């Protein structure tokens, strides 16, 4: 959502910090917060003025008309404040229909004043600009300010100066206070603009001879402007409306939402309720809540929420487990219902999101059965068949009753089933699988001939425009036709999947050439990107610079902007500098409303139509589609969006626009054009803009509008119909009717879906539309029936002529999508069994990285997982780490370290220097671990005694690997060997090979004291003992790891630490290029050459 209410304390804190005015504002920062946990001694220490001044106390919990409700204590001493708070603090209170606990109060200095010194000031945002209201009689009895106050509209990008304030607002204000008031209101407006407020009311504003006092303040800020205002706002809190508690689960989901590109929302309405929802889509979530309330479930509705924007499997798992946890805390005598609903997704992989929900259901299967939960599922969109399949499977395997439905079932039908208002079908009809649409040959089956318009052309010569004359449909310069079969677009953003979807749509519509001419992506250089046009591969240019793209593609008149919310404004502003662009679609959600209004103003000046922000876009069947609109090809074909029908629609929601595609295709001859204007409070183009376009488009025979709670745009349709400007039949339904039934305000999924006054409620708008002559169903459940009824009447009157269906061309399926659907298989080029990075978290040999840290497995444990696919005993992990420590380095003189140093001093980088050192490891340097392990193992396993082994090796003239040291001896032992030997003997369950090697050492050292078991030999034999006797490996596995060189890996890994150390050491010491001295080189040349 966008506009969010803040507490009075937060509002005043920001005001006192950042307002700039010549008026003397008194009592700055003089307020004290009191809660049930307040330490009064500490409070007095922080606010000593509490003891010396008369005080005012009031709740700060977004409660309106506190004075009228007797919730303000005035002119009290500190003891009086405490007495006043005693029966109220922490107690339950009822305000209107809402009941809640009073637990947050504000104490401020009492300001003695007269009624004549009280004024009313309010600033609030609208599409056209910001209204400033002023009334010279403020206070508790101010009354209907809309009717009484002086009002001034400050247009977008305009400034409010003191002279205008005096002239238009301060007409009835006392002369001696006009200057102070003008300065304060001017500063207040600038403060309101700079900190992205959407509503700011002060009542009363008191002006005395001492200065200005802000007594009571109410405010809302645009929460989407957080990235702009973070420095000034700080960590701002948004309290829930009075009567609704702030639950930790709501905060948890809000935190998930903030960290995700997807949208995740949760509001708890009644935690003891019986009916729970988990709905995909901002618009769909409102429709489901409406239907539940319409069918009498308002008192049992437990939550409102939605997930959308393609959340990952892990995100939907976290969201689902939160809801399942909440609904299984308290039992209900009638059991509970979970509605997992949603419209037809445009781009969300339904199977992926459902797999997250299925995981959560499996985890909570015990509590779900215990609480007698029945689950109803309805969804459509990409890969939805697989999603429904896994959902049905989990019902069978867990024994939880789960009823699963797809696009063949009306979206809200499951609500009626869940509440017992309609029967649950035993075998619901199943929609065709994706492959059936995409892989069948065009002529393989006979094509039915449903009703549709007689011609595929955009307009027919025998069509007659409406007879009634009226003002032009669009603002001057804006075209009634946005898209045609020849429309060309530029896509801003590296959205290859969306572009391929547009090209597939173009191909199935039999367009002559692709609709995407170029892409703009400022983060790479100019290049070309490969796409498919049917079977062929084509290249589409990608430009770093928008100017280059526009210059090289003058035929383009549409820009589809996939820029993020932070850059969408700037990129759209830049786009409007090019006269060739007539339509811009802004996909991003979360653009601050103040910036959107600037976009709208410039678009109106330039004659540009903006669709969005916060939209999936729009579609004109047979001609053009924006980005992901209409979903994947299976939905395009199922909803017959490859050719035009007779019905045009406009909605706010992208998901609901796809649902309308489905409803319209099932009840009429199909869609002529459909636009989702976006869920923000100020969409770039309005319902009326598009309705008037449709009215003036000959091919459109009827219009469908899916309105929404919030705003007043739908009333313009009422006026258009009553004044005769709109003559075509209009079917309209405004979603959000349930809002009137809730005791406290609910902000629905879309930023604009919140009524600020009675006229903005869905109920009021539906009633007005009906009275104006618009076809209005009784509920969304009946929308399809009304559309069908109006359509059939038009067919009966001959307005729409049935025509033969023409099959679309076959489009090849993408390989990656076909593989995901399980339609094809191909041998993988690579196989891996140790690590999987594809999911929400990294997995080492089946163990999530979080578990690795939780179990404190350390480097040895991780090495065990990655090298051996085993979770090794703790002593084995410790032994591996000790091996890495003792092999880490052996000074700069050894060949590997020497090479590393030479390379580093030659100016090479770390990787080159490290590699040069590692390349010296072999039989002569570092390779003795493997050789020692193999040699001792072979001797031990063959059954020969140590003396026989020594004699045999001597006879064959071979060295015993792992025996001998240049410096160390039996009299000067190697401490590395001693440490490891002690550890192994103390912790290993058995050490037969180590014992054998030590017996060999006794024989060799009796001949020469430096023929000791060295560190390579000890690690080699001890490692074999570990593999064979730790219990994690079979004998075959242990032998295989020795054969494939696992032991050399220990030396390579350990010594890499030392080599890197030598590299960093040389760089730190700033050593220059090394040249070996001549006197250390013996030049031995052939005699005849030296002569």
From Swiss-Prot:
GO terms for cellular component: cytosol. Residues 4-265 form the ATP-grasp domain. The modification Phosphoserine is found at residues 263, 451, 455, 459, 653, 829, 1090. Its cofactor is Mg(2+). The modification Phosphothreonine is found at residues 447, 629. One of its GO terms (biological process) is fatty acid biosynthetic process. It is found in: Cytoplasm, Cytosol. The modification Phosphotyrosine is found at residues 131, 672. Keywords: Acetylation, ATP-binding, Cytoplasm, Isopeptide bond, Lipid biosynthesis, Lipid metabolism, Magnesium, Metal-binding, Nucleotide-binding, Phosphoprotein, Transferase, Ubl conjugation. There is a cross-link at residues 530, 536, 544 (Glycyl lysine isopeptide (Lys-Gly) (interchain with G-Cter in ubiquitin)). Citrate binds at residues 309, 346, 348, 364, 379. Mg(2+) binds at residues 257, 260, 262. It holds the Pfam family Citrate_bind. SUPFAM superfamilies: Citrate synthase, Glutathione synthetase ATP-binding domain-like, NAD(P)-binding Rossmann-fold domains, Succinyl-CoA synthetase domains. Phosphorylation results in activation of its activity. Glucose 6-phosphate, fructose 6-phosphate, fructose 2,6-bisphosphate, ribulose 5-phosphate, and fructose 1,6-bisphosphate also act as activators. The modification N6-acetyllysine is found at residues 530, 536, 544, 938, 958, 968, 1067. InterPro entries: ATP-citrate_synthase, Cit_synth/succinyl-CoA_lig_AS, Citrate-bd, Citrate_synth-like_lrg_a-sub, Citrate_synth-like_sm_a-sub, Citrate_synth_N, Citrate_synthase, Citrate_synthase_sf. In the N-terminal section; belongs to the succinate/malate CoA ligase beta subunit family. In the C-terminal section; belongs to the succinate/malate CoA ligase alpha subunit family. This is ATP-citrate synthase.
């Amino acid at each position: 959502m966008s506009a969010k209410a803040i507490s009075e304390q937060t509002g005043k804190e920001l005001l006192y910090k950042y307002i700039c005015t010549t008026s003397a504002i008194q009592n700055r920062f003089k307020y004290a917060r009191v809660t049930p946990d307040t330490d009064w001694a500490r409070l007095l220490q922080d606010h000593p003025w509490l003891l010396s001044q008369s005080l005012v106390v009031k709740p700060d919990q977004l409660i309106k008309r506190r004075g009228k409700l007797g919730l303000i204590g005035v002119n009290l001493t500190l003891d009086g404040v405490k007495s006043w708070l005693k029966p109220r603090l922490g107690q339950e209170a009822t305000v209107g229909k809402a009941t809640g606990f009073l637990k947050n109060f504000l104490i401020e200095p009492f300001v003695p004043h007269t009624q004549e010194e009280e004024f009313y000031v309010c600033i609030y945002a609208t599409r056209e600009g910001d209204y400033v209201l002023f009334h010279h009689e403020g206070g508790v009895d101010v009354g209907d300010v809309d009717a009484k106050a002086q009002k001034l509209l400050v247009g977008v990008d305009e400034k409010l100066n003191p002279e205008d304030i005096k002239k238009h607002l301060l007409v009835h204000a006392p002369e001696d206070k006009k200057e102070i008031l003008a300065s304060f209101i001017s500063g207040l407006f600038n403060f309101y603009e700079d900190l992205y407020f959407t509503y700011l009311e002060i009542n009363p504003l008191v002006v005395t001879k001492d200065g200005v006092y802000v007594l009571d303040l109410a405010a809302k800020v645009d929460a989407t402007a957080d990235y702009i205002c973070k420095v000034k706002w700080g960590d701002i809190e948004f309290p829930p409306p009075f009567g609704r508690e702030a639950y930790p689960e709501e905060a948890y989901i809000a935190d998930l939402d903030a960290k995700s590109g997807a949208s995740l929302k949760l509001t708890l309405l009644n935690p003891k309720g019986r009916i729970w929802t988990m709905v995909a889509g901002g618009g769909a979530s409102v429709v489901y809540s409406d239907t539940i309330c319409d069918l009498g479930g308002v008192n049992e509705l437990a939550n409102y929420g939605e997930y959308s924007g393609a959340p990952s499997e892990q995100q939907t798992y976290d969201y689902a487990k939160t809801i399942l946890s909440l609904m299984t805390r308290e039992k209900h005598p009638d059991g509970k219902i979970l509605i997992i609903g949603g419209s037809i997704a445009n781009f969300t992989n339904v199977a992926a999101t459902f797999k997250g929900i299925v995981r959560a259901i499996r985890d909570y299967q015990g509590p779900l059965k215990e609480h007698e939960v029945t689950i109803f599922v309805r969804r459509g969109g990409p890969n939805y068949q697989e999603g429904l399949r896994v959902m049905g499977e989990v019902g069978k395997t867990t024994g939880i009753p789960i009823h699963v439905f797809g696009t063949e079932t009306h979206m809200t039908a499951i609500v009626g089933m869940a509440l017992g208002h309609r029967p649950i079908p035993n075998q619901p009809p199943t929609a065709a699988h994706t492959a059936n649409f995409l892989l069948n040959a065009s002529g393989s089956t006979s094509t039915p001939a449903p009703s549709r318009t007689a011609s595929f052309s955009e307009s027919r010569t025998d069509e007659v425009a409406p007879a009634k004359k009226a003002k032009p449909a669009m603002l001057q310069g804006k075209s009634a036709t946005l898209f045609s079969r020849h429309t060309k677009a530029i896509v801003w953003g590296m959205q290859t999947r969306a572009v391929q979807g547009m090209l597939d749509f173009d191909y199935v519509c039999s367009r002559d050439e692709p609709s995407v001419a170029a892409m703009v992506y400022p983060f790479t250089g100019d290049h070309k990107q490969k796409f498919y046009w049917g079977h062929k591969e084509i290249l589409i240019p990608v430009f770093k610079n928008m100017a280059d793209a526009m210059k090289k593609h003058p035929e383009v008149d549409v820009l589809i902007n996939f820029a993020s919310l932070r850059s969408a404004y700037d990129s759209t502003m830049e786009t409007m500098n090019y006269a060739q662009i007539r339509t811009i679609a802004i996909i991003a959600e979360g653009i601050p409303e103040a910036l959107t209004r600037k976009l709208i103003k410039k678009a109106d000046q330039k004659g540009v139509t903006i669709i969005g922000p916060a939209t999936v876009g729009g579609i004109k069947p047979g001609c053009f589609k924006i980005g992901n609109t209409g979903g994947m090809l299976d939905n395009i074909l199922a909803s017959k969006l490859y050719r035009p029908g007779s019905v045009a629609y406009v909605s706010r929601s992208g998901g609901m626009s796809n649902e309308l595609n489905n409803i319209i295709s099932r009840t009429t001859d199909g869609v002529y054009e459909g636009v989702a204007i976006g869920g923000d409070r100020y969409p770039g183009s309005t319902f009326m803009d598009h309705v008037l376009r449709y009215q003036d488009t000959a091919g459109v025979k009827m219009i469908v509008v899916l309105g929404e709670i919030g705003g007043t745009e739908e009333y313009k349709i009422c006026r258009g119909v009553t004044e005769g400007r709109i003559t075509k039949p209009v079917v309209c339904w405004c979603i959000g009717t349930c809002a009137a039934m809730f005791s406290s305000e609910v902000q629905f999924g879309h930023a604009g879906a919140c009524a600020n006054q009675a006229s903005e409620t869905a109920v009021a708008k539906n009633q007005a539309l009906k009275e104006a002559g618009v076809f209005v169903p009784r509920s969304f459940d009946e929308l399809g029936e009304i559309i069908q009824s109006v359509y059939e009447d038009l067919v009966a009157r001959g307005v729409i002529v049935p025509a033969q269906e023409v099959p679309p061309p076959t489009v090849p399926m993408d390989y990656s999508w076909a593989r995901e659907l399980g339609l094809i298989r191909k041998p993988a080029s690579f196989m891996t069994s140790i690590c999987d990075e594809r999911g929400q978290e990294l997995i080492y040999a089946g163990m999530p990285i979080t578990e690795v840290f939780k179990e404190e497995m350390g480097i040895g444990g991780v090495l065990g997982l990655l090298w051996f696919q085993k979770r090794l005993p703790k002593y084995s992990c410790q032994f591996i780490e000790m091996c890495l420590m003792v092999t880490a380095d052996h000074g700069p003189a050894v060949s590997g370290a020497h090479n590393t140093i030479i390379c580093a001093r030659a100016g090479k980088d770390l990787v080159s220097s490290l590699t040069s050192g590692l390349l010296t490891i072999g039989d002569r340097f570092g390779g003795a671990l493997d050789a020692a392990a193999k040699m001792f193992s072979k001797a031990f396993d063959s059954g020969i005694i140590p003396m026989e082994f020594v004699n045999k090796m001597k006879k064959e003239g071979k060295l015993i690997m792992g025996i001998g040291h240049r410096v160390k001896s039996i009299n000067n032992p190697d401490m590395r060997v001693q440490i490891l030997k002690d550890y192994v003997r103390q912790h290993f369950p058995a050490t037969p090979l180590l014992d054998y090697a030590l017996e060999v050492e006794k024989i060799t050292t009796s001949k020469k004291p430096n023929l000791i078991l060295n560190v390579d030999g000890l690690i080699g034999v001890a490692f074999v003992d570990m593999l064979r006797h730790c219990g994690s490996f079979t004998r075959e596995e242990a032998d295989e790891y020795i054969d494939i060189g696992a032991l050399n890996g220990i030396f390579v890994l350990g010594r890499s630490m030392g080599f890197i150390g030598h590299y960093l050491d040389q760089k730190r010491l700033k050593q220059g290029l090394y040249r070996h001295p001549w006197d250390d080189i013996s030049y031995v040349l052939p005699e005849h050459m030296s002569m």
